[in-house]
Amino acid sequence: MSTEGGFGGTSSSDAQQSLQSFWPRVMEEIRNLTVKDFRVQELPLARIKKIMKLDEDVKMISAEAPVLFAKAAQIFITELTLRAWIHTEDNKRRTLQRNDIAMAITKFDQFDFLIDIVPRDELKPPKRQEEVRQSVTPAEPVQYYFTLAQQPTAVQVQGQQQGQQTTSSTTTIQPGQIIIAQPQQGQTTPVTMQVGEGQQVQIVQAQPQGQAQQTQSGTGQTMQVMQQIITNTGEIQQIPVQLNAGQLQYIRLAQPVSGTQVVQGQIQTLATNAQQITQTEVQQGQQQFSQFTDGQQLYQIQQVTMPAGQDLAQPMFIQSANQPSDGQTPQVTGD
C-alpha cells in the first residue's frame, strides 16, 4: 500500500504520529512472522472463507489464503481508523463517529471504492420529517331532536282544490306563534283547528272571486251567529248564539252596502290571558273596525275595504274581548 495522498501538515497530534509510523511498523511485523503467528488471527478465518466462497469461480481455497486475507484486512482497518481519528481530533472530539470515517475515505484516494458504501452525512440532503396527514372525512349532517319546555299545539289545515283530490297538512305551533295563511287562486280551503286547553287559534281565509262562502247572508236573508266550543276531547262544537234585534241591526248597519270588502289571510292567536290578543293581517285596501257591547262582552267587527268594482265575497268575524274560561270564541260569518 502507498502512503501518498495522505494528510499534509506538521501537526504533532497522536493520530498523525501513529499514522506516520504505521507502515514502517507493519512492514517490520510482516518480516518477523512465523508459522505460529498464522495459527492465531485477530479476525475469524471462518467468516473470511465464507466470503471467498460467495464467488462462483472459486472451486477450492488453500489453507494459506484465509490467513493472508485476515492479515490484510487487519492492516486495512487499522489504517482507516487512524485516518478517521485525525478528523475526530480536528473537531476536538473524543469519540469516533461515522462521519469521521466518511471524511477519511473522501480525503484518501486509496479508499475511493468505499464512497458508495460509507457516504458522508453532510452530503446527504436533510431528511424531511414526514408530516402525518390524517384524512378527515366530512361529518355527516347530524339531526338533533329536542323538546321545548312548552307543549306544542297541533293545527291541522285541510285544503281542497276545485276538481282535485283533497290534501291535508299538519303544522305545529307554539303558544303565541302567528301563522299567515294565503289562499291560492281558484281554491276553497276549509280549515280544521285542533288546539289545546287554554289556547285559541282562529284561521280566516278569504275565498277568491266567483266562489261562495259556506255561510252567506245576502239581501233579505237572516244572519246567524255561531259560537265554537272546544271540548276536552278536542272536538269543536258550534252552538248558535242568540242576539237581540238591536245587536243584529247594529251588525247589519256595520256592513257596507256594496259587496266590495274582503279579509285575506287573517290569523288571530288568542293567548291564555284573555287580555293579550295578537293579530297578524295580510290585507289590501283600508280596514274598518266596529265594536258593540252586549252586557259584559265586547264584540269587534273587523273589515277591509277593497277598491270599487270588485265583486268579492265577504267573510266577517266577530271576536269577543271577554273570552270565557272554557276557550269559547264567538264567530260571525256573512257578506
Swiss-Prot record:
InterPro entries: Histone-fold, Histone_H2A/H2B/H3, Transcr_DNA_Rep_Reg
GO cellular component: CCAAT-binding factor complex; nucleoplasm; nucleus; protein-DNA complex; transcription regulator complex
Assigned keywords, A-Z: Activator, DNA-binding, Nucleus, Transcription, Transcription regulation
Function: Component of the sequence-specific heterotrimeric transcription factor (NF-Y) which specifically recognizes a 5'-CCAAT-3' box motif found in the promoters of its target genes. NF-Y can function as both an activator and a repressor, depending on its interacting cofactors.
Subunit record text: Heterotrimeric transcription factor composed of three components, NF-YA, NF-YB and NF-YC. NF-YB and NF-YC must interact and dimerize for NF-YA association and DNA binding.
Name of the protein: Nuclear transcription factor Y subunit gamma
GO molecular function: DNA binding; DNA-binding transcription activator activity, RNA polymerase II-specific; DNA-binding transcription factor activity; protein heterodimerization activity; RNA polymerase II cis-regulatory region sequence-specific DNA binding
First-listed, main subcellular location of the protein, grouped into a coarse class: nucleus
GO biological process, one term: positive regulation of DNA-templated transcription
PANTHER family: HISTONE-LIKE TRANSCRIPTION FACTOR CCAAT-RELATED, NUCLEAR TRANSCRIPTION FACTOR Y SUBUNIT GAMMA
Family per similarity comment: Belongs to the NFYC/HAP5 subunit family.
Subcellular location: Nucleus
UniProt cross-references to Pfam families, sorted A to Z: Histone (PF00125)
